[in-house]
From Swiss-Prot:
PROSITE patterns: FHIPEP. Gene3D superfamilies: FHIPEP family, domain 1, FHIPEP family, domain 3, FHIPEP family, domain 4. InterPro entries: FHIPEP_1 (IPR042194), FHIPEP_3 (IPR042193), FHIPEP_4 (IPR042196), FHIPEP_CS (IPR025505), T3SS_FHIPEP (IPR001712), T3SS_HrcV (IPR006302). Its main location: membrane. GO terms for cellular component: plasma membrane. The gene is hrpI. Involved in the secretion of harpin-pss; a proteinaceous elicitor of the hypersensitivity response in plants. This is Hypersensitivity response secretion protein HrpI. The chain crosses the membrane at residues 21-38, 45-61, 68-92, 111-135, 203-223, 244-262, 311-327. One of its GO terms (biological process) is symbiont-mediated perturbation of host programmed cell death. Pfam families: FHIPEP. It comes from Pseudomonas syringae pv. syringae.
Length: 695
């Protein structure tokens, strides 16, 4: 026995290694079946193989996680149709020549006829009509519509893949994989549309073969074999019905298989691909109320006169019990969901053993807040986030929306890695007004803003008292502060993983440039430069310019800040365009005496250069910055300083004056149009100017 098993294993392995030869042999054998007479014993074997293949295919279709898992099905469908037609030709030849087509054909015919030719013929015709008009026609129509819709949806899906790739949501490898799957899906549904024509033609050919067998067989029996008409009718009808059934039953199974594959809608919401049987069971049992209503309906049918009461009551009990059982099963799930709403460390149901990472972006609201207002605010915040991603080439996480009880009913909170980054007030009755607009005003109803630094310049007023003070609604203020918060935390999300994704994109578009860059620059230094650029709101989209600049300077310069300055100079056109207004670039300068004070306060360590200014100088600088760079300025202005002061000055202003761009003279081209707004004088008051100068 072991020798037989080992021999079969060797044959199977050899067939798998030479699968192309096996396929070619199978096709040639089908052709020879149509022209060469076969013995009845071999016909029985081939009929059994045909039925087995049909059963195997329908079971395979039920366990497929998605249609693409059986992308060769159109070719298999063509081969099985050819095999079935060749088998019908062989059995027809045996019926007409020998009045014998093997044991399986005769057994099928005798079983269905059951002593009554008319009943057997009617049953056979019903099976044929069901296969041809219902299953085959329906599958053909679904294949046609599926192919059309798949082709129509291809451009949108391709654009979605390209958009995800540009936003660094997926890698280049993942994008190629998705494009390949999309192409494979379109080819599958297109091939299925054509393959269903074979199934339709096979059903029509089966009807014609049945008519030929019956009419030709009776004629041959009466005219050539001198049989009585009744005997010929009995013999050839049984054989014809048997032959038709051994063709129609596999055809019916394969038609159902085609319909199941075409109509398959994979459900991957949970991230696990399930077979169709499991999905049907889960979805049917997902609504317990439907089972209970069906049970009541069955009881109604049982009450009708003349109905089999016991049958309907039994079915009603089964449906009702199923519905109640599902309700009991759904209750623990609801409890688990309510428990899951509580922090895992507070539910007291289990000992936590898994690693729980910090959540990146969380928007927190009070449960009692207006859902419509929350939805509108979140939508606008998402628009600002997406604009930053597109405009600056950033990789920002998605938002998690959470309702918590530990904040006031009129508050909003934004956390980054579970650390509060922004806290603001939701209010309809008050509006925000800049504090400098209230100088000299006596408004006792004014409420100071939050202690967050960006909101030190704001106070809250009742809406009816705002008058002509240019008030801002709480929603608008939250959105503006959220945009600044997103910009300030963007460098945290340009780590090694995100930098590797950018480098992978560069490898696909500029392979030589990417190879040279990896040779001269480590991934860590590249990431550090990108973080510095993002911290100063410099767009990262011109990645080719950034890469070429780093390749040019990184071998003789080790300081990341200096490398960043080189990149900024290379991106001077992008930076100028970013801050340029209708009248050109509005700049504030620093007087030479003030530059001297700043240079005197420079201190340098092995890792950084920073300012150590006196209290008087720091207060004067902060005071003049508040005047020159209000948070809600009509046009964006920049602070223009010498190259050696730019980086440490930007670091000094990073916390309180994040919205103030600091540029160096080297980052302004000779053709740039510059309007000087005034000069910072750290020994005197701010000096506003009205003159225009071209740099």
């Amino acid at each position: 026995m072991n020798r037989v098993i080992n021999f079969l294993n060797m044959v199977a392995l050899s067939a798998m290694r030479r699968s192309e030869l096996v396929g070619a042999f199978f096709v040639i054998a089908i052709v020879f079946m149509m022209i060469t007479p076969l013995p009845t014993g071999l016909i029985d074997v081939l009929i059994a193989v045909n039925i087995c293949i049909s059963c195997l295919l329908i079971m395979l279709a039920m366990h497929l996680p998605r249609p693409l898992a059986f992308s060769t099905f159109p070719a298999v469908l063509l081969l099985t149709t050819m095999f079935r037609l060749a088998l019908s030709v062989s059995t027809t030849r045996l019926i007409l020549l020998n009045q014998d087509a093997g044991h399986i054909v005769e057994a099928f015919g005798q079983f269905v006829v059951g002593g009554n030719l008319a009943v057997g013929l009617v049953i056979f015709l019903i099976l044929t009509v069901v296969n041809f008009l219902v299953i085959t026609k329906g599958s053909e129509r679904v294949a046609e519509v599926g192919a059309r819709f798949t082709l129509d949806a291809m451009p949108g899906k391709q654009m979605s893949i390209d958009s995800d790739l540009r936003a660094n949501l997926i890698t280049v490898h993942e994008a190629r994989k998705r494009r390949a799957e999309l192409n494979k899906e379109s080819q599958l549904f297109g091939a299925m549309d054509g393959a269903m024509k074979f199934v339709n033609g096979d059903a029509i050919a089966s009807l014609i073969i049945v008519a030929i067998n019956m009419i030709g067989g009776i004629s041959i029996g009466v005219l050539q074999h001198n049989m009585a008409a009744g005997d010929a009718l009995q013999l050839y009808t049984v054989l014809t019905i048997g032959d038709g059934l051994i063709a129609q039953i596999p055809a019916l199974l394969i038609s159902v298989t085609s319909g199941m594959i075409i109509t398959r809608v994979p459900n991957t919401e949970a991230g696990v691909e399930a077979n169709i049987g499991r999905e049907i069971a889960e979805q049917i049992t997902s609504q317990p109320k439907a089972w209970i209503i069906a049970s009541v309906a069955m009881l109604g049918f049982a009450a009708l006169p003349g109905m089999p009461t016991g049958v309907f009551i039994t079915i009603a009990i089964i449906c009702g019990a199923g519905g109640l059982l599902q309700l009991q099963r759904a209750k623990p799930k609801a409890d688990e969901q309510r428990t899951a709403a509580v922090a895992p460390e507070m539910n007291g149901k289990e000992d936590l053993r898994t690693f729980s990472p910090s959540r990146q972006f969380v928007l927190q609201f009070h449960p009692g807040q207006d859902s419509a207002q929350i939805e509108a605010l979140v939508s606008e915040i998402r628009k600002r986030r997406n604009r930053l991603v597109v405009q600056y080439g950033l990789t920002l996480p998605s938002f998690i929306i959470e309702h918590v009880d530990d904040i006031a009913p009129d508050e909003f909170r934004f956390t980054v890695y579970d650390v509060p980054m922004l806290k603001a007030t939701f209010t309809q009755s008050h509006v925000a007004v800049e504090a400098r607009q209230l100088e000299g005003e006596n408004l006792p109803a004014a409420i100071p803003g939050n202690t967050d630094r960006q909101e030190d310049q704001w106070v809250w007023l009742p809406a009816e008292q705002s008058g002509e003070l240019n008030p801002v609604s709480s929603t608008t203020l939250i959105i503006e502060r959220m945009e600044r918060a997103l910009q300030s935390c963007a460098p945290q999300f340009i780590g090694l993983q995100e930098t590797k994704a950018i480098l992978s994109w560069l490898e696909s578009e500029q392979p030589e440039l990417a190879q040279e860059m990896q040779r001269v620059l480590t991934l860590t230094r590249f990431s550090a430069v990108l973080q510095r650029l993002a911290s100063e709101c410099v767009p990262l989209r011109a990645i080719r310019v950034i890469a070429e600049t780093l390749i040019e300077h990184c071998q003789h310069e080790r300081d990341t800040n200096v490398l960043t300055d080189y990149v900024r100079i290379a991106l001077k056109s992008q930076i100028y365009h970013q801050y340029c207004g209708a009248e050109g670039l509005q700049v504030w300068l620093v007087t030479p005496e003030s530059e001297g004070l700043l240079r005197d306060g420079l201190r340098q360590t092995q890792t950084e250069t920073f300012f150590a200014l006196s209290n008087e100088t720091s207060q004067m600088l902060v005071q003049q910055l508040h005047i020159a760079f209000p948070v809600r300025a009509p046009e964006q202005a920049v602070l223009l300083v010498a190259q050696d002061l730019r980086s440490p000055l930007r670091t000094l202003l990073r916390e309180e004056f994040y919205h103030v761009p600091v540029l160096s003279f080297a980052e302004i081209s000779n053709a740039a149009k510059v309007k000087v707004m005034g000069r910072f004088d750290l020994e005197d008051d701010l000096e506003p100017l009205d003159n225009e100068h071209a740099a």
